[in-house]
Amino acid sequence: MAGGVGGRVVVGRHVYGNLYGCDSRVLRDEAALITIVKEAVKVANAMLLSIGSYRFGPGGGLTVFAVVAESHISIHTWPEHGFATVDVYTCGDHTDPKAAFDYIVSQLRPKRVEVFFGDRSMYGE
């Protein structure tokens, strides 16, 4: 992974955010969310290992979670509030977590997005 400063080595990049004002029908559509996450894996240039989903009660929110060789991609939804959180964490210079995040946002079409970035780092000895 990309080198760091002062012995710090970035081993992963984390892009995550809050999506407000999403269409609640999409946030309840398990098949659509699974398709979106699978495509986000491709956009990130990651390798899908497994994908799962869980619905929180009838008509409730969903969690869709992809385990990728490089880490994970997830969407958690609260359709009753038109709200979703998205989490994309990848390791390796070959991956692009921001592109995957942007793809998911383009599919959920929120009215407002808060996005955060974090480097996961370690220090050499």
UniProtKB/Swiss-Prot annotation:
Its EC number is 4.1.1.50. InterPro entries: AdoMetDC_C (IPR042286), AdoMetDC_fam_prok (IPR003826), AdoMetDC_N (IPR042284), S-AdoMet_deCO2ase_core (IPR016067), S-AdoMet_deCOase_pro-enz (IPR017716). One of its GO terms (cellular component) is cytosol. It catalyses: S-adenosyl-L-methionine + H(+) = S-adenosyl 3-(methylsulfanyl)propylamine + CO2. Pfam families: AdoMet_dc (PF02675). The modification Pyruvic acid (Ser) is found at S71. The keyword Lyase applies. The active site is at S71 (schiff-base intermediate with substrate), H76 (proton acceptor), C91 (proton donor). One of its GO terms (biological process) is spermidine biosynthetic process. Disulfide bonds: none annotated. It comes from the Archaea. Its cofactor is pyruvate. Binds 1 pyruvoyl group covalently per subunit. The record marks E70, S71 as: Cleavage (non-hydrolytic). Is synthesized initially as an inactive proenzyme. Formation of the active enzyme involves a self-maturation process in which the active site pyruvoyl group is generated from an internal serine residue via an autocatalytic post-translational modification. Two non-identical subunits are generated from the proenzyme in this reaction, and the pyruvate is formed at the N-terminus of the alpha chain, which is derived from the carboxyl end of the proenzyme. The keyword Nuclease does not apply. Keywords: Autocatalytic cleavage, Decarboxylase, Lyase, Polyamine biosynthesis, Pyruvate, S-adenosyl-L-methionine, Schiff base, Spermidine biosynthesis, Zymogen. One of its GO terms (molecular function) is adenosylmethionine decarboxylase activity. HAMAP family: AdoMetDC_1. Heterotetramer of two alpha and two beta chains arranged as a dimer of alpha/beta heterodimers. This is S-adenosylmethionine decarboxylase proenzyme. The lineage of its organism: Archaea, Thermoproteota, Thermoprotei, Thermoproteales, Thermoproteaceae.
